[in-house]
Amino acid sequence: MGLSILEFDKNNSEKFKILHKEVITTFELNKTSVSNNKRKYELIKICYHVDKLLKTWKCSRICLEELTINSSDKGNGKTFNRLCNNVWCRNLVINKLKMLSNIHGYFITEVNPAYSSFIGNILYGNESTPDMIASSIEVARRAYNKFKKGHFYLPIQLDHLNEQWKQTLNGLNNWKEMFNKVKKLKWKYRFLLLDYIQNAVFSKTYIKQKVTLYTF
């Protein structure tokens, strides 16, 4: 789970400061040896942790991916199906956050996450902003601009990329074309947590809770 807290410029909704970046990993919690009740209990505690962050930073809104996942056979084995269909408990988390938002007076905005991981990694990903945080930044940007026409996708930006990327991707019309091109070339674009975990400024493993927190 990637979290980021942003402060947007009142005069330019595409400009913002990143105030806080955090990853909460639940790998141990997702193991088959963990009971559903234990898993749900710890997920609810994570919701309270998020709620505390919102109050600490005086946030007015929480931004989430608008996802609908139907139970199905993904064709990758029972363990993978279980992780996709059962373990995530997304509805539990969303409903708890909505309950807390009603109590404490902040808004919840859900947005279409199309290409948010790809765009997030390309625009915001770096050695101190791993994949899931980069994605959360793009989701937050979309949510902040949700009701403004033409703000769903930012213009393609290549200036910060290396020359190989610039030359190969120059002239593409949209992010979908760029994603398909990168996928076809099998280029790595994700800043994976495990590759940059040593850059976390703070980390703590909660053994009983089976959760690890990283702050970047």
PLM segments and residue spans:
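Positively charged, helix-rich recognition surfaces that bind polyanionic ligands
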Residues: 1-216
